[in-house]
């Protein structure tokens, strides 16, 4: 898979690591970013071991992973079996790096796990304060205070992401017999922040801290380490 230059892939672990004992809480991953998290490589270029899971052997637009369940950009908190599929208008049988990540996690865990994903192409963390349109991941307090989730007609992707996670917790994860644990935050994004690249680290750190804070408030668990 060929990725655009200057993209950043960050894996932020919120727990000690994966333990495959079935008696432990169910594993949950949260994933966010822009086009290269949503997926921009045709499914025809999927690795052969993923193509083997397809039910459509022409365009590889349909199929299902055995264990991975995903809620992706739906705002409803509903999980379905994962298959690489971009959330965009037009052709959406496209994949991103996480398709490979989830495949190998399946091989490791050999049990059901859940992914909450929100990804939109052409977006940035740093907001444009003068823009009437646009969608941003910013957690800057002064900007976030006046923002609304994109799922409600606003321009905050971060608030939409938080809403999606909370909905998934309320509708599914909190009802699991063995409980759940958010193990990791996958983030892949970068080039749309080029104009404010010097601020990128601080903006990303602030955004991650906001997600951790909201999850601690929601679950009572400390995700600060």
Regions found by a protein language model. Name each.
Residues 1-4:
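N-terminal secretory signal peptides that target proteins for export/translocation
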Residues 6-16:
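Sec-dependent N-terminal signal peptides
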Residues 18-22:
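Sec/Tat signal peptide C-region and signal peptidase I cleavage site
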Residues 23-225:
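Cell-envelope and extracellular/periplasmic
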């Amino acid at each position: 898979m060929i990725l655009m230059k200057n993209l950043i892939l960050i894996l932020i672990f919120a727990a000690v690591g994966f333990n495959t004992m079935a008696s432990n809480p169910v594993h949950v991953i949260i994933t966010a970013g822009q086009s290269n998290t949503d997926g921009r490589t045709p499914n025809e270029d999927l690795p052969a071991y993923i193509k083997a899971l397809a039910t459509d052997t022409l365009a590889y637009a349909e199929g299902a992973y055995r264990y991975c369940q995903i809620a992706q950009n739906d705002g409803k908190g509903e999980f379905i079996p994962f298959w690489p599929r971009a959330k965009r208008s037009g052709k959406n049988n496209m994949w991103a790096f996480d398709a490979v990540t989830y495949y190998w996690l399946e091989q490791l865990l050999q049990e059901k796990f859940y992914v909450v994903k929100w990804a939109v192409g052409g977006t940035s963390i740093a907001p444009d304060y003068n823009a009437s349109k646009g969608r941003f991941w910013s957690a800057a307090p002064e900007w976030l205070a006046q923002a609304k989730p994109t799922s409600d007609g606003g321009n905050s992707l971060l608030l939409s992401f938080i809403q999606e996670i909370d909905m998934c917790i309320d509708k599914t994860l909190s009802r699991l017999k063995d409980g759940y644990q958010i193990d990791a935050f996958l983030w892949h994004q970068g080039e749309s922040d080029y104009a404010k690249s010097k601020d990128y680290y601080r903006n990303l750190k602030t955004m991650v801290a906001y997600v951790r804070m909201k999850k601690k408030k929601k679950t009572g668990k400390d995700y600060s380490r």
